[in-house]
Amino acid sequence: MWHLSLYEELESTNDYLIEFANPNEYCLCVAESQTKGRGRNLKKWQSPKYENIYMSLSFSTNQELENFSSFSLVSALAVHNVLLRQNIFTEIKWPNDIYLNKKKIGGILIETFTRDRKNLIVVGIGLNIFMKNNTEIDRDWTSLKLEYENIEIDRNKIISEIANEVLLSKL
């Protein structure tokens, strides 16, 4: 069963699920913006309102958490596959970055913890969709709209397809 949480603004979708995820459900949290979005090694993730996808999903597992050490790559591949079905050709940079035309378009953050004697995985995904090129970031980046001006982009469809693809990948 899915538990869906939608927010106008959160500090971080990953932090939200780490605090509130139910170990007996698949949980999906989506925010229109994040005030403390982050990537690996606590790098700040720019999260302007209404422009991108900021999502996290969580699930429990009976497996040891160490078995999920490469799940960031599996999750990046899930994002890649969803975009590929829309004729958007991305590349994956190990271990957790998604690139489009040699510029970063997204990232994955995997966090694990134990609650109620169940191991939980939180998969955070940030994907630049409508971000404009006046946003300052410390590396080359792009968004789907900057690269594909004439493409019709439905963020909700992308979110649902990514969530399904990631959860199918864990099986």
Predicted feature locations:
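Generic marker of residues within folded, mature protein domains
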Residues: 45-47, 98, 115
